[in-house]
């Protein structure tokens, strides 16, 4: 510790190399991974960058002990960068994506889980004013009912993505949030694992979402999204509630496209900055207006005024597709959880399957 304090003095007068060497030694030889990484300047750049991140984290109030322990041996994870470049939401067609996620087996399991936990789910839904079947739908798709939470180091994954220039600001914020999660003692460092992009727990919350939305529903003093399903479902429910979920409203519906439609003429004049998936939504129209264009619900909707009386945007289909999706306001809330139209449609369809079996 004496060495590191001396190094910080040198940093203030501009001798950056001393700082880098001392911090690297403290973090377990951080710079030594240069020989194991791919050729080029990136390992050295990453090591220097991590020194700056350490400084930022401590300035934000995270203890030096937490930061130093978290950064021991951290180096870029090429698996994370490869996964980032081939996300299924962007490389698969709607049909391929849905076939792999909204399967008969998953729908059956979702209905079983819903029935077994219906009383608890309805208590949670009532408290947060959301619709209970969606809790199971999110749980199913995010972690296969809690069974697949990921085995990537959260810190290493976020450091890798934060160092990458494409979305550096976003992932730097998530890295700081992850360090805060550790610093507050919510999970031990050796258990701090999850998805390749830094999502964690049975509901695959990003660290900032955990800090903002995680719930202690059973009152045991812990916000446990890793092994406590009551906390998992309540955290999802609170997230949806805080992102403008409208209880009792439809997410949308499957539709048949009977004839070609010039969707380019139906696009909004402008799109609110944020989720890029919204760029593929038309402006909202009534079901009557859509029907006049040859787009009709796959299932009759007129009996329910909460559905038939609303306006819906169309997720613009690929050329030649005869099945599409009209989506409402709750669809936007689903997109806030994961900004991908295919993902959001999967959530809606799976929730519909649970509801259909429960009626």
Question: Where are these predicted regions, by residue range?
Answer:
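Substrate-binding clefts and substrate-entry loops adjacent to catalytic sites
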Residues: 99-112, 165, 169, 186, ...
């Amino acid at each position: 510790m004496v060495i590191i304090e001396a190094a910080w003095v040198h940093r203030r007068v501009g001798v950056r190399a001393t700082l880098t060497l001392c911090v690297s030694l403290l973090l377990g030889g951080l710079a030594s991974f240069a020989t194991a990484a791919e050729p080029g300047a990136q390992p050295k750049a990453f090591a220097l960058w991590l020194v700056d991140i350490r400084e930022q984290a401590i300035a934000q109030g995270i203890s030096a002990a937490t930061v130093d322990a978290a950064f021991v041996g951290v180096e870029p994870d090429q698996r994370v960068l490869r996964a980032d470049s081939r996300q299924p939401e962007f490389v698969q067609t709607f049909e391929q994506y849905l076939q792999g996620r909204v399967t008969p087996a998953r729908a059956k399991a979702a209905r079983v889980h819903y029935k077994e936990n219906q009383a608890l789910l309805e208590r949670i839904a009532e408290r947060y004013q959301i619709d209970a079947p969606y809790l199971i739908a999110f749980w199913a798709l995010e972690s296969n009912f809690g069974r697949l939470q990921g085995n990537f180091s959260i810190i290493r994954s976020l450091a890798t993505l934060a160092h990458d220039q494409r979305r550096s600001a976003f992932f730097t914020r998530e890295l700081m949030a992850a360090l805060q999660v550790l610093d507050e003692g919510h999970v031990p460092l050796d258990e701090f694992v999850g998805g390749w992009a830094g999502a964690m727990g049975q509901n695959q919350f990003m660290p900032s979402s955990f800090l903002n939305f995680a719930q202690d529903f059973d009152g045991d003093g812990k916000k446990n999204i890793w092994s406590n399903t009551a906390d998992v479902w309540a955290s999802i429910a609170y997230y949806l509630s805080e992102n403008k979920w409208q209880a009792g409203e439809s997410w949308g519906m499957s539709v048949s496209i009977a004839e070609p439609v010039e969707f380019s003429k139906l696009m909004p004049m402008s799109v609110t900055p944020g989720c890029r998936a919204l760029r593929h939504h038309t402006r909202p129209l009534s079901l009557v207006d859509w029907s006049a264009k040859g787009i009709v619900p796959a299932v009759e909707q007129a009996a329910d005024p909460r559905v038939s009386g609303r306006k819906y945007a169309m997720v613009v289909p690929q050329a030649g597709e005869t099945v599409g999706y009209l989506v409402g306001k709750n669809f936007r809330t689903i997109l806030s959880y994961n900004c991908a139209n295919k993902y959001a449609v999967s959530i809606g369809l799976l929730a519909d399957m649970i509801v259909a079996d429960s009626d």
